[in-house]
Amino acid sequence: IDFTATVDTTQSGDSTKVEFNDDININLDVDGVVKAEVGLGLTDGKMSHTGGNIIAGEKAGLYTITLTYKKSAGAIADSFSYTCTLTKESTLPEACYLIGEGIKGWTFPGDAVAMIPAHSEPGCFWAIRYIEAEKGFKFSEINTDWGKDFTGRTTNTGYTVKDNNCYVAENGLYMLEVDYKNGVVTVSKAMIYGMGDAFGGWNEGANAFTVSGDKFTATTAAAGNLRMYAGSTFAAATGNWWHREFNVFDGKIEYRAGGGDQAAVAVTAGQTVTLDFNAGTGSIQ
């Protein structure tokens, strides 16, 4: 028996997993303590229930992934195998950078700041920065030199362009987003949200962080695993909060980007989470 799916990868080396349910686990009791593993990944190149992600291919683009099942006793790998075939290579840029006085400086590559790939949205990148109104910035497809820099695409909102540089109207924390596929660049008020038990629920768009100068802060409502994400103006992000998820590890902000679930970060009720995106740091106290 063959099962096929088409996957549009954002970047070269993107990965996926196989699920037989709407999750890689099925809860077997009310409390969710006992679970059955029903997903498939790779262990030493072979299919297994507890394996890692399946790398689609070395190039970004459309892939046809075929999962083949044949009844066989023994290990999972004796019953399941897969193939990944590139059917259309992507022509979209695989990266986006910010450069300029409003970001860090005008010198490549040291002053260029990499934007984050949005999960499951090919060609979309995002970043949060505190930007001062009188300091200009630009976008770039590369971080090595000038020549691929730009101030916008087809549709541009939330900023002005003067002397071939971008400017915001006032000092503040901004969400910068680029969609190469649809030719869109937006700059909007940055919004950070908590998600899950640590913030009292799983409702998207609730549990907003507070802006404190050039930082975000929030207080956890209960014990649980810390999960956070950035709000987006892009339609594909609606209902997909995890497309722009991140967390704090050893004092640094680390982004999910195109990867799987990040490692759990346990917190207790009443802890203060502080995020400094310009510095790339965070604290949980």
Which role fits each region the language model picked out?
Residues 1-285:
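Insoluble glucan recognition modules
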